[in-house]
Amino acid sequence: MRFRSFFFSSSIFSLSHSRSPSLSSSRFSSLSAAMSPALEKSRQGNGGCNDDSKSKVTVVGSGNWGSVAAKLIASNALKLPSFHDEVRMWVFEEVLPNGEKLNDVINKTNENVKYLPGIKLGRNVVADPDLENAVKDANMLVFVTPHQFMDGICKKLDGKITGDVEAISLVKGMEVKKEGPCMISSLISKQLGINCCVLMGANIANEIAVEKFSEATVGYRGSREIADTWVQLFSTPYFMVTPVHDVEGVELCGTLKNVVAIAAGFVDGLEMGNNTKAAIMRIGLREMKALSKLLFPSVKDSTFFESCGVADVITTCLGGRNRRVAEAFAKSRGKRSFDELEAEMLQGQKLQGVSTAREVYEVLKHCGWLEMFPLFSTVHQICTGRLQPEAIVQYRENKL
């Protein structure tokens, strides 16, 4: 595994930001008043670039992982002279039980009290419920929402993104279209006409939020320069990011591992033991690699040994939300639906593994590959009630 210090960072299918110069004086004053002396000192120290030449970042999404991403980026934006201090974060407008709007509470308390309680995001994070306004003038877009919302978000932003804009997707999942599967980075690139990298890895958001050491992988195509910029923007002493020239491989790892985590949750719910769980994880990783290479022959073997690969499978199968909800599903012997369990256990967060399992199943069925991927096929059939949870080990592995 390669370690790169933050301080030295420099197929068969096609598959929110900185303060604008025109920002109202009242909003500017409000933000400035909230800033700490350290922030003011940092701004003075970044005098080498004028505001117009600095990169402006918007985080599109404000859930658990989106809030953590904003925290990471906000801390670095203050230190890096080429980035504007303010980081905008698009917040889907919702009203909290006390009647206050979530975005207002975030701006008042500097904390996402619903999805990341107890963690300060940084005084330079500004929540904005208006998607178009949040991305206005931004030239660095970070997409981090449930994958099922991405098509609608891209349609809203179509024609609104202008100039030299770069994007990165932290979204795990895919869209299944008539012509085949479409990765989220491809969806962003095609609908918005911009380059899109990806960031995936063994990243449980709450652990990164409290600054426990973690790794991640940035997948890029084309020039290494933009990948290094994203590495610089995300890296901290406790969050180590490595660039890999393999967008599809990195993104498919982040997508498919959630299906494996659902399988691991079934094993835990049925108390089948660690040996069985290890076997499921191995088979799952093997099917991840095989499917990735069938969809994109250019996917590199080495990608599966990065944080986005085997490390993410291990982390997600041990502690992720997909594993946890699947465990509860298996304990109920399928009598409680995933929708019911998601609402009860995740409190507004979205479960990715079940919808991804369905999408993967559709691809396998369309291509005639169901028998080649028995674990992926079985997970979907258990999720939909066609099979009982015990079926997770009642098949013969296909030697791909």
Curated annotation (Swiss-Prot):
Tissue: Expressed in young seedlings, flowers and siliques. Expressed at low levels in roots.
Catalytic site: 257
GO molecular function: glycerol-3-phosphate dehydrogenase (NAD+) activity; NAD binding; protein homodimerization activity
Catalytic activity: sn-glycerol 3-phosphate + NAD(+) = dihydroxyacetone phosphate + NADH + H(+)
Subcellular location: Plastid, Chloroplast
GO BP: carbohydrate metabolic process; glycerol-3-phosphate catabolic process; glycerophospholipid metabolic process; phospholipid biosynthetic process
Keyword entries, A-Z: Chloroplast, Lipid biosynthesis, Lipid metabolism, NAD, Oxidoreductase, Phospholipid biosynthesis, Phospholipid metabolism, Plastid, Transit peptide
Pathway: Membrane lipid metabolism; glycerophospholipid metabolism
Transit peptide: 1-32
A Pfam family assignment: NAD_Gly3P_dh_N
EC number: 1.1.1.8
Residues where NAD(+) binds: 61-66, 92, 149, 172, 205, 321, 350, 352
Membrane-spanning intervals of the chain: none
Main location: plastid
Gene Ontology cellular component terms for the protein in this record: chloroplast
Record Gene3D superfamilies: N-(1-d-carboxylethyl)-l-norvaline Dehydrogenase, domain 2, NAD(P)-binding Rossmann-like Domain
Binding site for substrate: 172, 321-322
Classification via PANTHER family: GLYCEROL-3-PHOSPHATE DEHYDROGENASE, GLYCEROL-3-PHOSPHATE DEHYDROGENASE [NAD(+)]-RELATED
Function: Involved in glycerolipid metabolism.
Family note: Belongs to the NAD-dependent glycerol-3-phosphate dehydrogenase family.
NCBIfam families linked: glycerol3P_DH (TIGR03376)
Protein name (record): Glycerol-3-phosphate dehydrogenase [NAD(+)] 1, chloroplastic
Organism expressing this protein natively: Arabidopsis thaliana (Mouse-ear cress)
Gene behind the chain: DHAPRD
